[in-house]
């Protein structure tokens, strides 16, 4: 779907401002304009979450933050990831030299804790026995479309606080949540401000794939080995980043207006109706499927023992449908396939 009308209107207005000396904007503040950070903080407050303006770091997308956040942690930090998983979590740590030795037979890294999420455990990871320094969680989940209840998420928060781990919580798909007992933010959990960083995207809730905007929340209470992570990320952000463009941040501000919220809800309803049709159709055809209720992804078991890539080829050659082979998300993704609504 195209960008919502009220967001386009805000973008046009900001573009016009750039053509006049009295309203021209140059380099943006490193951490984001106050008008957008205030709107973001208010949205958290409306959900009962305590997030201050100076805990919000605006960027040009959640993917960049997913890849860059590891830079403020030690080179020998041990990471834990769900398996299957969004590849950026692992690959960015590989590039940082943090993941050890790769085993081509198992397609795993020696210094990464993998938490299998398969049909057998209802795509729900178990708390790691070995203590990780960083725990990557994504809910609603990419690629499986699974979700986590507040009670279950609280267990992760309690675990992280007990073990001294930091949770990197990717909430890019929170706008697709339709069920009441599913948290939209990890900060809905007691104690999360001392153990969790949250990542958000404007691409998933507002279609900013071609505009690029996202943000990261780091509470001031969050410490790692006695070092506060909020000012550390602020220093890193200011060193390597010049701020998201004024025009795009004004567009992002429009997302939080009543009109913007109404337009975006209609778009999300459109996608989720697609997901419902795909989910219903696949179930009636006898496929084993999950997701598609609180996320725009449908995760299905490949039929007849096909590998993920064999099923990809079959769909492309026989019915002209393109999806994503599950094996691309990690070893536990083999034998699965992701469709997008």
What kind of feature is each model-predicted range?
Residues 1-18, 31, 35-341:
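PLP-dependent class I/II
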Residues 20-24:
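Pre-Walker A segment
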Residues 25-31:
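A short, highly charged nucleic-acid-interacting micro-segment common to nuclease
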